[in-house]
Amino acid sequence: MPSSISVKLVAAESLYKRDVFRSPDPFAVLTIDGYQTKSTSAAKKTLNPYWNETFKFDDINENSILTIQVFDQKKFKKKDQGFLGVVNVRVGDVLGHLDEDTATSSGRPREETITRDLKKSNDGMAVSGRLIVVLSKLPSSSPHSQAPSGHTASSSTNTSSTTRTNGHSTSSTRNHSTSHPSRGTAQAVESTLQSGTTAATNTATTSHRSTNSTSSATRQYSSFEDQYGRLPPGWERRTDNFGRTYYVDHNTRTTTWKRPTLDQTEAERGNQLNANTELERRQHRGRTLPGGSSDNSSVTVQVGGGSNIPPVNGAAAAAFAATGGTTSGLGELPSGWEQRFTPEGRAYFVDHNTRTTTWVDPRRQQYIRTYGPTNTTIQQQPVSQLGPLPSGWEMRLTNTARVYFVDHNTKTTTWDDPRLPSSLDQNVPQYKRDFRRKVIYFRSQPALRILPGQCHIKVRRKNIFEDAYQEIMRQTPEDLKKRLMIKFDGEEGLDYGGVSREFFFLLSHEMFNPFYCLFEYSAYDNYTIQINPNSGINPEHLNYFKFIGRVVGLGVFHRRFLDAFFVGALYKMMLRKKVVLQDMEGVDAEVYNSLNWMLENSIDGVLDLTFSADDERFGEVVTVDLKPDGRNIEVTDGNKKEYVELYTQWRIVDRVQEQFKAFMDGFNELIPEDLVTVFDERELELLIGGIAEIDIEDWKKHTDYRGYQESDEVIQWFWKCVSEWDNEQRARLLQFTTGTSRIPVNGFKDLQGSDGPRRFTIEKAGEVQQLPKSHTCFNRVDLPQYVDYDSMKQKLTLAVEETIGFGQE
């Protein structure tokens, strides 16, 4: 039986701003089944309009489609009509069966508040934001004549009322509503809806009339029957947002387009289940961001709402599930739960048992499903079992209903659910997956949040060490936790990430240079460095070590890599772990071999050693006791193990105790000691320095092209040139284009830009006589379309090895 409903359009938020210098004047057009049309007033110059206007719609059934479109009044007469987004809502999905008694215990109509993300139309124009809508079924009134479904809007005379916040009420027909922004706008709205220029309204109108035109004038069927008779037990008939009928089997929690029959066998039902599963998988594979590339190694997260989601229109289904909206018929909330509403009208749920809140309706079991590189399900967990997101995290949906996550602590985004294990390829080493989980936890801690404001540091390239020392040491730790803004003297470049990456790259080369006597190369090789025990030759050495500790902490805090590797023992010392004999191998291989030989062989009568060590200090040999009166205690087979432990402790730790303490004082001013202990020494090395080895195939795999395609000759020449270079030249190219020669542990897929992860990009730009130009903040290189390989290689090499400094376009 047809019913009447009330639709209150509360507000919209975060609308898309198409003009740089002005905000839109948004108004909304509400349409039921394509022939009942209402319009709100226009809110002036805002991206967050607040209407709070109520509309009444008659002759509604649960299959009716409510379409809400948002336009910019200033542009409504233009070609695109100032389109700002559309939302389609099936009334039955929100209010349930309209023939049921849905009144509350107080006799007032039950209201359902929903929040829906705005969607694109067929023209593909970018939209953003969401609508807050309140729907309620009105009490039954006296019978009235029903207009035939074949009548157009211009011939109908049904009346409705429009209620606004100021209390005024006016009467309007379908053609003319006094609540329209203007008379011209109202006529334009009507003509637009009749001509079908808006794809969403046109689709809903066509599908509704095609399916219901023959039956709506005679009888309205319930969800459990149709013109062919009653459905089998446990089956229900529903209509998606485009008016297409599908069937829900509540027995198996599956959906199908095929109408079930009473004699349907279990085998047929099983085949249908498999078919639906495969259909859902194919739909999921096709979900990508607009303009994005489909990468088999990436992981897609899908939110589902059980049997309430039809087998098509996954975008609307995922958007509905993400809002955590309720559906009538779900029953009472579990014990200890309460439903509340935000000031914007969005429903949320309070669990008084655990004193937590969630957007997810506990009566609706939602799943987060993770797909692997072969598009097979590798994880499926209920949202309720995953628990809340870490502090500062938020889950959002793209325009294509793909779930992504926002880390407000670091102002970055990611596809990966921070509550789930690593979404890396399944063939990567286990330590990388473990490391990623630890990093997510580490970054989510309140102490690692970037504070409001900016920290400005200005340095000269030729005096970067001393200038950085003066700038960083004069700042308080709280100031250093604000967003870093690095400025090179005499250069115009703005720091959106690339300048600061180059700052840390250049500074690490200077402050770890043995020329300053603060660090020295290990005896094992000339690549790893260790603290110089004779750094005291510089009377200010402890202040410099505190400064270096601050720089390392700054790099970790702001996600910047340092171009240096310490000996492994230093990372263990930072974690307060005890050093052992194996750590000596990276410090001095000859000493390690000698101590190891002592443990494996008898030394009685062979070695004449005591519990002391000789330390050379600027040409003077000083004897140091490893234990009290150690120089008079002989080393034997019985106590040689103790000697090895004491000598290792002295050789690695005790000689540099003062310098290391100053270093850690500076480091812990930005990174609390208890947080960094979640890592082991190998992971801490990756956290500070990233990975130096460059994988060309991984680089190519995670590269985007603008103006070029991967098959273009210039691109082939570029990768041929990179392949011919050695690792040092590749590192220089990476530093030229991104500001650092290091890459994250997850490879090029996790390269960071100015606003979060940003892939390496090659753009077609510049004249052939020009050198390539880099944009380090955006990991982008402008590569002209050179005419031959030799000229491209020559100019690329010249740009990488000879250019210096930042400019501004």
Curated annotation (Swiss-Prot):
Q: What is the effect of changing residue 777 to A?
A: Loss of ubiquitination
InterPro entries membership: C2_dom (IPR000008), C2_domain_sf (IPR035892), E3_ub_ligase_SMURF1 (IPR024928), E3_ubiq-protein_ligase (IPR050409), HECT_dom (IPR000569), Hect_E3_ubiquitin_ligase (IPR035983), WW_dom (IPR001202), WW_dom_sf (IPR036020)
EC numbers for this chain? 2.3.2.26
Ranges for domain HECT come to 705-809
Question: What is the recorded phenotype of mutating residue 618 to D?
Answer: Has defects on both initial ubiquitination and chain elongation of substrate proteins
Tell me which Pfam families the record gives.
C2, HECT, WW
Cross-link of type Glycyl lysine isopeptide (Lys-Gly) (interchain with G-Cter in ubiquitin): positions? 258
For this UniProt record, the keywords arranged alphabetically read as follows:
Cytoplasm, Cytoskeleton, Isopeptide bond, Nucleus, Repeat, Transferase, Ubl conjugation, Ubl conjugation pathway
Q: Does the UniProt entry include the keyword Cell membrane?
A: no
Q: Which GO terms describe its molecular function?
A: phosphatidylinositol binding; ubiquitin binding; ubiquitin protein ligase activity; ubiquitin-protein transferase activity; ubiquitin-ubiquitin ligase activity
Protein name as it appears in the record: E3 ubiquitin-protein ligase RSP5
This protein's species is Saccharomyces cerevisiae (strain ATCC 204508 / S288c) (Baker's yeast)
> Gene name on record?
RSP5
